Each structure stands twice: as C-alpha cells, then as structure tokens.
Amino acid sequence: MGTEPCRFCEIAAGRSDQEIVFAGDGLVAFLCEPPATWGHALIVPRSHKEDIWSIEPSEAAAAMKLARRLAHAMRDELGAVGVNLRQNSGGKAGQDVLHFHLHVVPRYEDDTVQPGCVWGAPPWQPPAGGDAERRRVADALRSALG
C-alpha cells in the first residue's frame, strides 16, 4: 500500500465524502468519480485486498451478489436498459487503485460509452448534471438497496 492510505480503504471506513450507496459487513458500494454513466458504482471489500488473486472466494461471491442487486436497482430506479460489469487486476489490465474493485455501470438508451472499452484513463465524458444529479442517483440506489 505504500505510505499513502488506500483511497478505497478510506471510503470503506467512512472517511470520505464519496456517495456510498451500500454499506454491509464485508462490502461497500459507492458512486465512481468520474462516472461513465449516472449510477456507475464500485463494489469494494472493506478489508484491504489488492486484486482478484487476494480476495477469498466468499468475497468474490458476495461482490457478484451485490452487483446483481445493484443491477436490479439501476434498472428499476434509474431506467437502465443494460449493465456492464468490469474488474481489472494488475497494471497491465488497467488497475489504477490497488484495492480490489468491481465496476457496475448502468447503460442507457442514449449513452455513448463504448461497452468494450478498456479502462485505464476514462475514455468517456462524465455525464452532465453535477452534484444534484449525483445526490439524486445515490439516494435512489440507497433506497432500493435498503
């Protein structure tokens, strides 16, 4: 982890102003900054695990179960017509934060993000709407996830 605290560990511990949409015993889901589309969320384990090789099978299963719940909330509350799941492990794969994370990206009829893009630096333009839209989306997802 180096000398800097892990950004995702800080978020999982509640020491960030990131919009958390789900906080469970082992996992936290929060809105990605910048988002590819409104509702783009990251699922991370609360404990620091660097990559796919570091997490326990039970943690991987829990992350996928939460991704499914998020996908339903994105469809039902935000009007998503599809969803992309993405997990990058290792620098060559585009992992830029060394804490396991699973992207859950809702897709809309009018979005322009390429579904097959390889994410390192965001190849998309963040959606318009600003803080008010981010709060609306976070509130809708939090409500749906209970």
Name each model feature, range by range.
Residues 1-146:
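HIT superfamily nucleotide-processing domains
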